Amino acid sequence: MDIIKTLYDYFPTSVYTGNSLVFISEDWRVELKEYKNTSFSANLKTVPIVRVKVFKKALNGEFLPGHYEDFQIDSVGELAAQIERYIQFSIGQNLRENV
């Protein structure tokens, strides 16, 4: 969860839930969560995997799961930049203004 706490500094409009970062707007919900490599042969320190899930609000008001992408970038600054770019292209809005 260290990477999620670190990413919180890059995304001040997000909400930290204890195990994920969540961005929410009237029409979208975006969730960032860290996943560990569960391979038994992976005893070496590896770059964490951050999964970004995008949900769109349906007509009934529920958020429906859409697409997701896994990011595994060593540099936290570059990781944050690529996640922000992915979210902006996914929802078609500027992350800092609308979500």
List each model region and its residues.
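Short, surface-exposed coil-to-beta transition loops
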Residues: G18, V47-I49, G66-H67
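Surface-exposed polar/charged interaction patches
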Residues: Y10-T17, T38, Y86-F89, Q93
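A short, structured beta-strand/loop element
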Residues: K33-L59
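Mixed-charge, Lys/Arg-enriched low-complexity segments
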Residues: K56-V99
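Negatively charged, low-complexity tracts enriched in Asp/Glu with abundant Ser/Thr
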Residues: M1-R29
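A structural detector for beta-sheet-dominated domains
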Residues: I24, K33-Y35, K53-F55, D74, ...
